[in-house]
């Protein structure tokens, strides 16, 4: 899937309408990706247009603590996709909706983790396939912390507690990449309302 720059994202100088919220679950201690979750939608309205989730096959045992934390099992991973297949499906959805190039994340680095792991598996992967995301990301955790700081409030907060402080409940299961991506999108939309002049 080789795409031109115009196909991979919207113009960086336009006000973007659609964003991709991205979340990963990782095995430990290796940090290998075991699940990709994404929600694509209109941030100004909070409308989610499409979601995506897949488990990723890995070549190592799944850590017991990660099984307890995420509920992901060896069976889930065995029936999953390769990271390459998972990325290409994610990229297809991101591009189809012409989402802004920088994904929304909780805590930063998820898009970079995908890129680095793909490059470590196949240094030529991005010679055949464009990377669908930009070099940056929109870290909702940091923006939320600055919002709290500006209002003289405690800055430390997890995703679920942060949603609660805006009158929202966490939907789904914590440490599920899709549910975390959807809830990060919901918080980003609510936070955007509060930041408008």
Residue ranges and their predicted role:
Residues 1-11:
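Charged, flexible boundary elements
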Residues 25-27:
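Short polar catalytic/cofactor-binding loops
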Residues 69-90, 94:
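Metal-dependent phosphoesterase signature
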């Amino acid at each position: 899937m080789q795409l031109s720059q115009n196909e991979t994202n919207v113009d960086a100088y336009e006000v973007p309408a659609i964003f991709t919220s991205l979340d990963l679950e990782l095995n430990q201690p290796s940090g290998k990706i075991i699940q990709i979750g994404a929600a694509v939608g209109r941030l100004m309205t909070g409308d989610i247009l499409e979601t995506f989730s897949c488990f990723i096959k890995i070549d190592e045992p799944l850590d017991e603590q990660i099984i307890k934390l995420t509920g992901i099992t060896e069976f889930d991973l065995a029936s999953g996709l390769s990271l390459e297949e998972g990325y290409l499906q994610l990229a297809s959805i991101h591009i189809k909706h012409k989402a802004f190039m920088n994904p929304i994340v909780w805590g930063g680095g998820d898009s970079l983790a995908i890129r680095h792991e793909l490059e470590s598996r196949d240094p030529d992967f991005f010679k055949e396939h464009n990377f669908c995301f930009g070099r940056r990301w929109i870290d909702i955790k940091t923006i939320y912390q600055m919002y709290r700081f500006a209002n003289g409030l405690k800055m430390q907060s997890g995703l679920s507690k942060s949603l609660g402080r805006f009158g929202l409940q966490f939907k789904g299961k914590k440490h599920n990449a899709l549910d975390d991506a959807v809830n990060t999108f919901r918080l980003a939309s609510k936070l955007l309302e509060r930041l408008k002049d």
